[in-house]
Amino acid sequence: MKNQKIRIRLKAFDHQMLDQSATKIVDTAKRTGAQVAGPVPLPTEKSIYTILRSPHVNKDSREQFEMRVHKRLIDILEPTPKTVDALMRLDLPAGVDIEIKL
């Protein structure tokens, strides 16, 4: 697997769970002999939703909710077959979305 790169993008609502998952991936890749670049923090997506508090009147009374999506990027340079096998067996939390590109 020479001259290849694995790019892993992680997304989660909870930044602590995201950082724990990123450190697990980095430790696993380094333990199997691959070079790792990252985790690189990407910009946080922030979505704000404004709704009326009452169901009928009072347009002045509103409530705002926000949803933040935190993201990290990890590049694994020159992965070995042992690295790919270890990453496939890695157990990560359910709240983290993982996108892998070769």
Swiss-Prot record:
GO terms for molecular function: structural constituent of ribosome; tRNA binding. Transmembrane segments: none annotated. It comes from the Bacteria. GO terms for cellular component: ribonucleoprotein complex; ribosome. One of its GO terms (biological process) is translation. Keywords: Ribonucleoprotein, Ribosomal protein. InterPro entries: Ribosomal_uS10, Ribosomal_uS10_CS, Ribosomal_uS10_dom, Ribosomal_uS10_dom_sf. SMART domains: Ribosomal_S10. Involved in the binding of tRNA to the ribosomes. PANTHER family: 30S RIBOSOMAL PROTEIN S10 FAMILY MEMBER. Belongs to the universal ribosomal protein uS10 family. Part of the 30S ribosomal subunit. This is Small ribosomal subunit protein uS10. It comes from Desulforamulus reducens (strain ATCC BAA-1160 / DSM 100696 / MI-1) (Desulfotomaculum reducens). The gene is rpsJ.
